[in-house]
Amino acid sequence: MLRVVLLFGAALTAPLRAQEAPPKKVAASVERLFGRGTRVDTIAVDDRRVLRIARGDSLLGFAQVRNVIGRDQPITFLVAIDPANRLKDVDVLVYREPYGGEVAYDTWRKQFRGKGADAPLEIGKDIRSISGATISSRSVTLGVRQALSELTAWHEQGKLK
């Protein structure tokens, strides 16, 4: 019995292996958020990959692909910010759960737009939960808050240019 508990406990604390988003989905998301004709460069910051999006000499913003665990499966999403460190949008790239896919709907995602790192980004405060997708909505909200915080800090520290 102890062995089962130890194995189960290890599964809960093991780090989530990075789930890759299909490159075509990332490219389509960047185009939808920033328009056509953008240049996307990948920057390594603190062992993470950040996308720098520009058109010509103009910086349009930054984006990062992240993963959170929904009820049982990873949810892969892209968080994009503008040069003023405001959330441009959140785009769910891969949703693997059988239920709760409403986190990918624009009607839910649009409540993140324009928020800064100073916003609470908490279910029940400035973000609505989704009935039937409570775990997914909480997980994505937490992941967005963490990504926004990191992207903003890196940008303010000059690690993103």
List each language-model region with its residue ranges:
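Sec-dependent signal peptide recognition
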Residues: 1-7
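Hydrophobic h-region of N-terminal signal peptides that target proteins for export
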Residues: 9-18
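Flexible, solvent-exposed loop/hinge segments and secondary-structure transition points
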Residues: 18-138, 142-161
